[in-house]
Amino acid sequence: ESDIGFDKHIPSIFSAGVPFAMIPVASAEALGRASPAHGALSPALGATEVFVYARADGNAAHSFHARMFAPEIGIVEDPATGSAAAAFAGVLARFEDLADGWHTFPILQGAEMGRPSLIGLEVNIENGALTGARIAGKAVKVSEGVLYV
């Protein structure tokens, strides 16, 4: 528990359509120790998906390092979660002191499971409020299917 939170960041629920419990941790080491606790989050809490994140080392090519767990819906860990990155825009607007304009925050996710993904997150701040977000990244097709109705 002593590893939870850093700077102004505290655990919170944020959503860009899908609610995520956003859990800041103090270091990459604490992030590496994170593991899903099946049943720990109930729908009454408002989120069953958990996005655990830490600020990256100053020498890293990314701003934040993250992991996403959703065992309640059958996802042990996800290597890249665009919907969580979109919700993370709200975290940045709330807990970072951002000047007006566009800001870029690359997020490394999936490294602990051997599937590192770099998600590009850009946020726009106007008059101190979040007014826009853009998510970018590359994907690898892992399956394909056809649904006939």
Language-model-detected regions and their locations in the chain:
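Active-site proximal loop and beta-alpha junction motif in alpha/beta enzyme cores
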Residues: E1-V149
